[in-house]
A protein has these predicted regions:
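Phosphate-coordination/substrate-recognition cap region in phosphate-metabolizing enzymes
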Residues: 1-57
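Generic beta-sheet signal
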Residues: 7, 98-108
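Short beta-strand scaffold positions
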Residues: 11-12, 81, 105-106
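Amphipathic, non-transmembrane alpha-helical scaffold segments
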Residues: 14, 76, 80-84
Length: 163
C-alpha cells in the first residue's frame, strides 16, 4: 500500500495497472485512460526474448535500438507522442481544476516516454526506467509556461523497499 490516499488514480485500460492500483490505492476511484496503454508490440506481444532471439524481425528491431515499428505494432516515436499528448491533457485538466495532486499509475514504457519528454533533469528514454512497483514524484510548477515537470523523488512500493 502506498503512503498516501489519492481520491482518483488514472490507469491505462490494460488490466495490470488497475490490479496494481487496487493494491497501492485501495480507496481511490480508478479512471481508465486508453492513451496511457503500453506500446503495442504487435507480433512480439506476449513473447519473451528467448522465444524471439532467432526471429529476424525481432533482431532487426533490436538492432535499430527498438526505434523501428514492431511488426503489426507501434513505432516508438508514435507511442511516445500518444503518451505525452495524454499525460499533457491529464496535467492540464488537473491544473485547470485546481487539483494539487495528480496520480497516474502506468506501465514502464509509459513512464519512460513521459519522463523523457517532460522531466527535469533531462535524460533519455531508457535512463528513466523506474523500479518495479515504483515511479516518480514530480513538481509541475513550470508546466503552464514551459511544459516541464521537475523530479522530486523516485518512489517504490514493494515489500523489499519497505524493510
Amino acid at each position: 500500500r502506498a503512503d498516501f490516499d489519492p481520491d482518483v488514480v488514472y490507469v491505462s485500460t490494460l488490466q495490470r495497472t488497475s490490479q496494481t492500483a487496487r493494491i497501492l490505492f485501495p480507496e481511490a476511484k480508478l479512471v481508465p485512460v486508453d492513451g496511457l496503454k503500453e506500446m503495442c508490440f504487435g507480433s512480439f506481444e506476449g513473447r519473451n526474448f528467448i522465444e524471439m532471439e532467432k526471429d529476424p524481425e525481432y533482431q532487426a528491431w533490436v538492432k535499430a535500438n527498438c526505434e523501428s515499428p514492431c511488426p503489426d505494432g507501434e513505432r516508438k516515436t508514435d507511442f511516445s507522442d500518444r503518451i505525452c499528448r495524454t499525460v499533457a491533457e491529464l496535467i492540464d485538466k488537473a491544473l485547470a481544476a485546481g487539483e494539487e495532486r495528480l496520480v497516474i499509475l502506468a506501465h514502464g514504457g509509459t513512464q519512460m516516454a513521459a519522463m523523457e519528454r517532460f522531466a527535469v533533469p533531462h535524460r533519455d528514454y531508457y535512463a528513466w526506467c523506474g523500479p518495479n512497483a515504483g515511479g516518480f514524484v514530480l513538481d509541475a510548477k513550470d508546466w503552464t509556461e514551459k511544459h516541464l515537470l521537475y523530479l522530486v523523488k523516485t518512489v517504490q512500493y514493494t515489500k523489499e523497499s519497505r524493510a
